[in-house]
């Protein structure tokens, strides 16, 4: 389809060139100009004053016709009539070979005559060549003006009707943004599935990406979260498999990599809907699933695979029946997140194992130096870059109302409890910095009759999957999570994003708040809780084009449950143990923050931080102890939930051991 406009343009230009050449010939005949024949299309020039006229090998009255039949195209501009200089050897297009053969058959007869003519014209030719070198653009413009004065100009109406406008670039040529406009490019079964999914118009990233990808271009795309990147790469991927008529025996043709299991499941869900009317095989490969069952499916042949990098590399190295040598397309979704979570080495190994002749797509919400490095090793030399939001003032979507609240350390949990209780009928996501912190607050809030769900990296996969779909299908509720849920997940109608613990950097903030206000005309709210010492983080957010305003909270209306919280943590052994783990992990996560000039663990008031976890006296945390040693000692003490009195626990450097008795003078006062 992309060649049709060029063919049409070529035919119309040839037609116009024919008319222009015929007019030029009439003018040349009136001026008594003589044209000399040259072998195989060579052009000689004679000087008439300061004017140059192009000469062809054919007779004067047939010059325009013969050159047009041989496919010759001049460089005349559309708006002006120019007589341009021809190179010493004319370029021959589609029908040139036939013309050369016919001229060669007559070359012997004309050989003597031609030599004589060339010898006679030799002085003039040398003179013409010398003048050729000295001619400037201004002289050629003067020649054009002189020619125009003697040639009858065509009507403006004729110009407008005969000369089409040049097509625009790939990213801006198409005004129609409906999926129906892809009817000549996309299979009708795919369009039918898209219609059944409820989509009629393409988003900006889809509009700019799908057509180039259907042409086989490599692509590096950057767009805000919730902009529709998933369909932007799934539609071309499915079309590639359909057009190549991939069968299970051909193995894997498309590979889609996702940073987290939840995002992989979500992408697989969209792919499943898109493949409703197709017969090709597709599958999900991720950690936490049954590996032997995955290996069996790979042996049978999966045409489109959605996978996480770790499990995929495992199968590529250890599953003999996995055929990926026929791979046609590699898609890396949330490329920056894949690199952030430590899959950089796995990704490089995967790229080395895959065939080099393939189409590659990199999609991400943010562009980092690591993503650029990945693009260099995975994309071809000239990939197409699509940046939807490069020229926009804000890095977050317009429908998002976001702000921050300054809260002292000792009142953080009281603020969170009051906020969740007030918004029980809404859908909220609360982000924490560590798995143990999520686990503790999940147990605590459910214990005090405030039902919440939780997702974190230390859960078993079945639990994570069940919780994820339970929250997706809920009309209201609260999900406590780590950054494992911050990327790519399309959870419907989330009203509030609460960042209880600040993110590691502004890019992570953008991804967290991207879970709300998704899609066209999406609306949502985001709340960032900061300690007074952490207000410097706002400067980094402003540099990243994140507009934040301060929210006003009536502190008199904050629920004062501090005394009840302390009594509960004191009396309930299991909650006490969980609170210790959470406090320890919070301090460690704070110490590992990348922006140490703002999030400095030495500036923390530990007694006040301990109050937010329900402790009157802060548990002991040794930041110099290796985290692996801490985990081993914790397991040696009975796993954190059981009670086993051992010497290792009594000598633990991580936290002080307490007994089941409520009267413990080391931790609590009567």
UniProtKB/Swiss-Prot annotation:
A cellular component annotation (GO) from this entry: chromosome
Composition bias, Polar residues: 31-42, 83-105
Chain positions covered by the region annotation Disordered: 31-169
Catalysed reaction, written as an equation: ATP + H2O = ADP + phosphate + H(+)
Skewed-composition ranges (Basic and acidic residues): 117-154
InterPro entries: DDX18/Has1_DEADc (IPR044773), DEAD/DEAH_box_helicase_dom (IPR011545), Helicase_ATP-bd (IPR014001), Helicase_C-like (IPR001650), P-loop_NTPase (IPR027417), RNA-helicase_DEAD-box_CS (IPR000629), SPB4-like_CTE (IPR025313)
Residue span(s) of domain Helicase ATP-binding: 210-385
Listed result of changing residue 523 to A: Decreased poly(ADP-ribose) (PAR) polymers-binding ability
Name of the featured protein: ATP-dependent RNA helicase DDX18
Source organism (scientific name): Homo sapiens (Human)
Lineage of source species: Eukaryota, Metazoa, Chordata, Craniata, Vertebrata
């Amino acid at each position: 389809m992309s060649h049709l406009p060029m063919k049409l343009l070529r035919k119309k230009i040839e037609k116009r060139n024919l008319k222009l050449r015929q007019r030029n010939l009439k003018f040349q005949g009136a001026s008594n100009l003589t044209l000399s024949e040259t072998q195989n299309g060579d052009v000689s020039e004679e000087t008439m004053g300061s004017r140059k006229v192009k000469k062809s090998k054919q007779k004067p009255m047939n010059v325009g016709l013969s050159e047009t039949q041989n496919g010759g195209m001049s460089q005349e501009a559309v708006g002006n009539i120019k007589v341009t200089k021809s190179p010493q050897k004319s370029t021959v297009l589609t029908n040139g070979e036939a013309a050369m053969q016919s001229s060669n058959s007559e070359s012997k007869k004309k050989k003597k005559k031609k030599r004589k003519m060339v010898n006679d014209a030799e002085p003039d030719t040398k003179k013409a060549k010398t003048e050729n070198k000295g001619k400037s653009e201004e002289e050629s413009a003067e020649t054009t003006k002189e020619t125009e004065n003697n040639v009858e100009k065509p009507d403006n109406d004729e110009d407008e009707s005969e000369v089409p406008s040049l097509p625009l670039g790939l990213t801006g040529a198409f005004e129609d943004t409906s999926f129906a406009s892809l009817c000549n490019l996309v299979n009708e079964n795919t369009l039918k599935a898209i219609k059944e999914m409820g989509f009629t118009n393409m988003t900006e990233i889809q509009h700019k990406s799908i057509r180039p990808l259907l042409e086989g271009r490599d692509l590096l795309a950057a767009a805000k979260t919730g902009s529709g990147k998933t369909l932007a790469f799934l539609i071309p991927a499915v079309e590639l498999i359909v057009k190549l008529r991939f069968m299970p025996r051909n193995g894997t043709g498309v590979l889609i990599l996702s940073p987290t299991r939840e995002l992989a499941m979500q992408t697989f869900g969209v792919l499943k809907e898109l493949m409703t009317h197709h017969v090709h095989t597709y599958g999900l490969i991720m950690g936490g699933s049954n590996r032997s069952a995955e290996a069996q499916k790979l042996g049978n042949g999966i045409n489109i695979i959605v996978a996480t990098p770790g499990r995929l590399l495992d199968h590529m190295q250890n599953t003999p029946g996995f055929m990926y040598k026929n791979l046609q397309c590699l898609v890396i979704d949330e490329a920056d997140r894949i690199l952030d979570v430590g899959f950089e080495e796995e990704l490089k190994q995967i790229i080395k194992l895959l065939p080099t002749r393939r189409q590659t797509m990199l999609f991400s919400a943010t562009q980092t130096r690591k993503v650029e490095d990945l693009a260099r090793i995975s994309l071809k030399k000239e990939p197409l870059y699509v940046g939807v939001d490069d020229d926009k003032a804000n890095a977050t979507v317009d429908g998002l109302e976001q702000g921050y609240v300054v809260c002292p350390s000792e009142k953080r949990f009281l603020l969170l409890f009051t906020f969740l209780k007030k918004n029980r009928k809404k859908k909220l996501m609360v982000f924490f910095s560590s798995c143990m912190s999520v686990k503790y607050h999940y147990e605590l809030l459910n214990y005090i009759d405030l039902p919440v769900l939780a997702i974190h990296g230390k859960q078993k996969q079945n639990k994570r999957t069940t919780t994820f779909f339970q929250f997706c299908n809920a009309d209201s509720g609260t999900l406590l999570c780590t950054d494992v849920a911050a990327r790519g997940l399309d959870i419907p109608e989330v009203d509030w994003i609460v960042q209880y613990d600040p993110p590691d950097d502004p890019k992570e903030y953008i991804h967290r708040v991207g879970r709300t206000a998704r899609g066209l005309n999406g609306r949502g709210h985001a709340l960032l809780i900061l300690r007074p010492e952490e207000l410097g983080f706002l400067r980094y957010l402003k540099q990243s084009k994140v507009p934040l305003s301060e929210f006003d909270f009536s502190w008199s209306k904050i629920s004062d449950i501090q005394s009840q919280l302390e009594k509960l943590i004191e009396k309930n052994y299991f909650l006490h143990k969980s609170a210790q783990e959470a406090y320890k992990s919070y301090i460690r996560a704070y110490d590992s923050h990348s922006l140490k000039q703002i999030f400095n663990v030495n500036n923390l008031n530990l007694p006040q931080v301990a109050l937010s976890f329900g402790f009157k006296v802060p548990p002991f945390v040794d930041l110099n102890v290796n985290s692996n040693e801490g985990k081993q000692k914790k397991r040696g003490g009975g796993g954190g939930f059981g009670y086993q009195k051992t010497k290792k626990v009594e000598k633990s450097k991580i936290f002080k051991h307490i007994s089941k008795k409520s009267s413990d003078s080391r931790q609590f006062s009567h």
